């Protein structure tokens, strides 16, 4: 691996910044100052230090984002802002992608990673990874709707697996409900279509959980952070 790529992967800085740091003599390889960005290094055997601190290479990275409305769950889009546009240069340099998608007008928990194997496992229909959503609904959800969700709703193109619907609150005067929905699938507009099947309309949708991962309530919309060690270990163990 090239030295500059290694330094970017270790979050020392972006590519331009890394080259300047090398020129400044702030990087050593096996105890010797190194200024060549093109130097080929062995990330497992060579000791690379930045300002005296040993750098450890990480192949995969994992970010939790509180996706805002209006951002596309994609790596690029000609018309809309993408979730990658919300990351800084260092995070984008890791070549991460969204593990699954949230609709443009849906907000909440989104996992960004460059670990294709984990992403595939989380999205595999065979694993039935639960995802929980909070929805504001125009209309009054009822116990009958709870039972309809539990049986599995027959939509036009597929029949939903049994899902859990919890009615959190109902406001008869405003004709609205707040519900919590847990599904093991993630089809296009699925929660909205399930609610529409019951004759109501989702007006706001937020994803709260995906498998063991729970949205950090301290993350504002558009903010992101690395997964904690505990979060990552639990997530990896859940698909092992």
Regions found by a protein language model. Give the residues of each.
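Basic, flexible Lys/Arg- and Gly-enriched helix-loop patches that mediate nucleic-acid binding at interfaces
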Residues: 1-240
């Amino acid at each position: 691996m090239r030295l500059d790529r290694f330094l970017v992967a270790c979050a020392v800085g972006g590519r331009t910044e890394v080259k300047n740091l090398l020129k400044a003599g702030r990087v050593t390889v096996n105890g010797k100052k190194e200024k060549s960005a093109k130097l080929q290094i062995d990330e497992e055997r060579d000791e690379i230090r930045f300002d005296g601190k040993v750098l450890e290479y990480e192949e995969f990275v994992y970010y939790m984002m509180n996706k805002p409305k209006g951002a596309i769950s994609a790596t690029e889009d000609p018309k809309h802002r993408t979730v990658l546009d919300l990351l800084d240069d260092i995070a984008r340099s890791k070549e991460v992608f969204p593990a699954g998608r949230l609709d443009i007008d849906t907000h909440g928990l989104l996992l960004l990673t460059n670990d294709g194997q984990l992403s595939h496992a989380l999205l595999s229909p065979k694993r039935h990874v639960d995802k929980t959503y909070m929805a504001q609904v125009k209309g009054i959800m009822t116990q009958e709707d709870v039972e309809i969700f539990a049986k599995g709703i027959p939509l036009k193109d597929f029949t939903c697996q049994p899902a859990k619907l919890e009615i959190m609150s109902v406001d008869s005067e405003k004709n609205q409900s707040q519900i919590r929905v847990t599904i093991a699938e993630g089809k296009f507009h699925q929660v909205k279509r399930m609610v529409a099947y019951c004759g109501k309309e989702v007006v706001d949708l937020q994803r709260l959980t995906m498998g063991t991962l729970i949205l950090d309530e301290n993350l504002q919309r558009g903010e992101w952070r690395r997964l904690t060690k505990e979060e990552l270990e639990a997530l990896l163990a859940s698909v092992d």
